[in-house]
């Protein structure tokens, strides 16, 4: 085991604080509409230019081990905030640095760190309650666009694109961000339920221009097993043929004689059919088949439910207005399922989302909700170079998460004003002793810091602006984009309540831990390798190589 070194009290804390400051100083220059860029080196390929706080934080590893511990603690603030709210990472970092800086002064003066932390926690709890009081729900597409614009560093086109996507797929819909192929941003919307399985034979294609199979008003057969024997299918095929409507078969697999017969009948025009594999695997496949059944008003033909292919009737088949089947995707448009059953299924999946322990499971369940309740939109980010696309894509991701947070918990005035306004509630707070009162003062001072940094990045005098905003009330604040004072809600400078709340809580949590740290244990640096002795390899005379 490697030898360890231990540092105590002020010496340990001062080294940790140095690390906090190094990371925070690199991250905070990105804050606000006039935030600066940070260039990140890459071992391979072009460097990355970004204004995304968490991207900058993740890149930082310091050579000094103790400083690096401090930097990693603040990196944790940014990561936690990003995971919970998807945005607000720079605000959280700025708040954490301010709380640590102010707290260090009091600890150095001999105040009890634990009482300071109790005061900090009390002030933050009061600030969060006040934030909830001044928060208002997002009701219009315009407000959603404004929130997205602020999060995207003031780029209106991104805000408009995200608002349009939410309009098209609804608040429950899935919106994903991809690299585009052109200079402009594009929005692709998939109506209905889409899953990643295509036709089992190209002979099902009836639209050669698009290379897809399109069928109108089809019946939909859902089966959880392989189909290889055509005799199992004959009864249901005969019933569908009599109805004169096409048939979509979704099963674990369709192969051999069964697939060949379907292809021949399709080519001859006897029965228009398309066969695709069921999406997913194992239990997830069963759940997805059940989703499709509920959406289309059919039933999954499975032994568990006591249904067999031979005895299947038209009543057990699903229906839809249209089906589009490509090489890799199948889209069910306007399923005939009962709205109440679909709503009940969505509620059931939402319960599973709350109980899910892994991010992967939660993401897949959220996709299922979107496919049942809304739709899927893809924002394709355009740009002239790969570097520009990557930088813009980071901002679109932030903006997307911010709008989700705004829909969830509402909005507050942006530009650091909400944190200035909650100071009023904290001023009246009293701790159990003088040290706790000092903890409350730490938070009071730290709440100014995001506004100070936004103003500094905009090239203005921070103290003057903070004083003027503090004199005002309600939504009055400083718009760094225009350099003017006014009602920030009216001018569209908004922040999601969840982002502001999460940033403050996470910053206070990690800063409190750092202030109450009294010892650090770290691996002792290894001694430098001894210099090579004279007369070693290559020590011969000129022109000789031993």
UniProtKB/Swiss-Prot annotation:
Binding annotation for ATP: 30-33, 51, 87-91, 415, 495
Keywords: ATP-binding, Chaperone, Cytoplasm, Isomerase, Nucleotide-binding
Pfam families linked to this entry: Cpn60_TCP1
Keyword check for Acetylation: no
CDD domains: GroEL (cd03344)
Enzyme Commission number(s) from the entry: 5.6.1.7
Location of the protein in the cell: Cytoplasm
Biological process terms in GO annotation: protein refolding
Location, primary (coarse class): cytoplasm
Family under the similarity heading: Belongs to the chaperonin (HSP60) family.
Function recorded in the entry: Together with its co-chaperonin GroES, plays an essential role in assisting protein folding. The GroEL-GroES system forms a nano-cage that allows encapsulation of the non-native substrate proteins and provides a physical environment optimized to promote and accelerate protein folding.
Complexes and interactors: Forms a cylinder of 14 subunits composed of two heptameric rings stacked back-to-back. Interacts with the co-chaperonin GroES.
Name of the featured protein: Chaperonin GroEL 2
Gene: groEL2
